[in-house]
């Protein structure tokens, strides 16, 4: 299992980094962590698999 961060930049409006990442599986969310700004996106690279966005509470939610 693995993930790749494809965009990583400082957020203009909040202190911290906002990312976009591609994951092999949903289980990779645990490895990715939650040390990013709300609005960060993680996409599972599998047909029909969900995408996730980090909310203000620091929880990855399916979008």
Regions from the PLM with identified roles:
Residues 3, 57-63:
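Tryptophan-centered short beta-strand motifs
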Residues 48-58:
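Short beta-strand segments and strand-loop junctions that repeat across beta-rich extracellular domains
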Residues 1-49:
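Extracellular/surface-exposed low-complexity repeats and stalk/linker segments enriched in Gly/Pro
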């Amino acid at each position: 299992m693995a993930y790749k961060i494809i965009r990583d930049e400082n957020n203009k409006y909040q202190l911290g980094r906002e990312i976009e990442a591609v994951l092999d599986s949903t289980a990779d969310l645990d490895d990715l962590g939650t040390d990013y700004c709300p609005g960060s996106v993680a996409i599972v690279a599998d047909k029909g698999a969900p995408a996730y966005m980090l909310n203000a509470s620091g929880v990855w939610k399916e979008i």
